[in-house]
Amino acid sequence: MKKIYLIGDCHLSRVSEHYEEDNNQVDMTFWGKAAKKIWDLDFEEMYKEDELSSGKESQKFQNDGVIPFSEIKDDGILFSWFGYVDVRTFLSAYGNADVVAYKYIKQLTGTFKNSNIVIIEPLPQFTEMLLKYEGISPHYTYEQRLYQNSDFLESLHVYAKEAGIKNFILQSEILDCLGVSKLIPEMTHDKAPHPVDGLQDKYNKKILNLFIKKALEL
């Protein structure tokens, strides 16, 4: 059975809720953390501090799904799913998509030297900036975020190619598996007391199935 380590932000935590250890074709270990952005990534420090994941958003018991970063080993296949928070909240303010993409690849290749790295492009942006209602995040238009998303992906693929990373899961593949052309507010869950940019369970399950399919193809 293939061993897959997955690291990412809150969207990965939500996807992990649908993984069944005893009824699956691949062995997956999930480390997802809410609001984790590429600019904060320092894998050496995360190993040193043994940083904890957020765990599952819908927890069956306290700390359900919470694991230390030391459980992410450099000996198998690594799926990395970061960038959503950067595109949503920060790139429009700083205009540094190229720098962020470069930092991301350097962190991955400098730390996971023995892994087969698969980069998952960031979850596509929602058409509406949902967190604006609580003042949690600055508000940027859909067009602004799409522009930054495009810049980031262009640089990401350039630096990944230079580093010898060939395996990607594209945003277009994520949208295709969901059967939509874009992410809209009606697709978000209502588990929080305010609007959040998190997908409903039925969509996260489809994304998990896409990840499993891609893992089996490697």
Model regions: which residues?
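Phosphate/oxyanion-binding active-site loops and adjacent basic polyanion-contact surfaces
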Residues: 58-61, 199-207
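Short, well-ordered alpha-helices that flank and scaffold nucleotide-derived cofactor binding pockets
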Residues: 17, 21, 158, 209, ...
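Short, conserved phosphate/pyrophosphate- and ester-handling motifs at nucleotide-, phospho-/glycolipid
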Residues: 9, 196, 200
